[in-house]
Amino acid sequence: MAGFERIVDERSTSGPDRSEAMVAYTKLNLSRSRRWLKQLNMLPELENGLPLVAPQNWLVLTEYWCGDAAQCCPVMAELARRTPGLTLRFVFRDEHLALMDHYLTEGGRGIPKLIAVDAATGTERFTWGPRPVAAQALVDTFRAVPVEQRDVEAMKEALHTWYFYDGCASVQQELLALCS
């Protein structure tokens, strides 16, 4: 969080687009991330972390300005904190495009993208992202509308409202299923 807070204090963001809009998204996302870290309700079956078969390393491609990351990455951080044998590292997508291009979602560089590997062998165990299945369905419905008819602001509001009411339960359930 220290890097996130510092970049907000500097009125900047990650990635090549340092426009005022991206800086504003970054500030908003710090607030969202802090809120989830403060009031995240873990599923009862995750109180003691994930049931890993073997130690894992999780690498998450992300950016500070990404709204989905602000909703999902705090869950990953909390799971890593609670799970013995799980290490977590966040890296910026736009600094690792060659890696990102191996993990495209429907041809796009959707983030956050979690890549889980076996800590002993380096074998990929699974990937997840950029958002829970139900949230992806909302995005897919939006993308089905002709570009000239899309209401981007309404879509963002609907997506973040969905995240609020979901309470990060879907992220937890999906990651639990992948680790079980």
Feature-to-residue mapping (PLM):
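Thiol-based oxidoreductase modules, predominantly thioredoxin-like and allied folds used
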Residues: W58-Y64, M76, P84-M100, V117
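Non-globular targeting/processing and membrane-anchoring segments
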Residues: M1-Q56, E78, R82-G85, D101-R109, ...
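A short secondary-structure junction signal
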Residues: Q71-C72, F126
